[in-house]
Amino acid sequence: MRKRVAIGLLVLLAASLSAAAAADDLKGADAILCTAVQAMVCTEDGDCVVDNPWAFNIPQFLEVDLKAKKVSTTKASGEERSSPLRTVERDADVIYLQGLENGRAFSLVINESSGMLSAAVARDGKSVGVFGACTPMPSPMPTK
């Protein structure tokens, strides 16, 4: 009996690992959910601080809509923040996103195969770097 339970757990673990690995493939995805994992803020005097993204008021999750050319906080965050994207480009397995709003220039670079995210925001006297991961957002359920 113990052997069956162990085998069952291994099968479940293998299935969940393969699903997680497939979930990060962004090829063809137009709606992407990204999470910030680590952030660094630097000021013009050379001081830099590394901390959790939320310590710098960086949203934990961002929804990226490539068709609508916008990046937004999730509804669950209650923040209702959204920024337009001026540039949306896919090239050589990488998604490049750029925007400009409220005196800030921002860029996101997302690897389509791994879902890994590198982002930067710059404004006068301050820059922010963020590392994270992205996954395709599920399609909405069809209504009957």
Which residues are covered by each model-predicted region?
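Short, low-complexity, Pro/Ser/Thr/Gly-rich segments in the mature regions of secreted, periplasmic
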Residues: 132-143
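Short, solvent-exposed loop/hinge segments that bridge or flank secondary-structure elements
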Residues: 28-29, 33-68
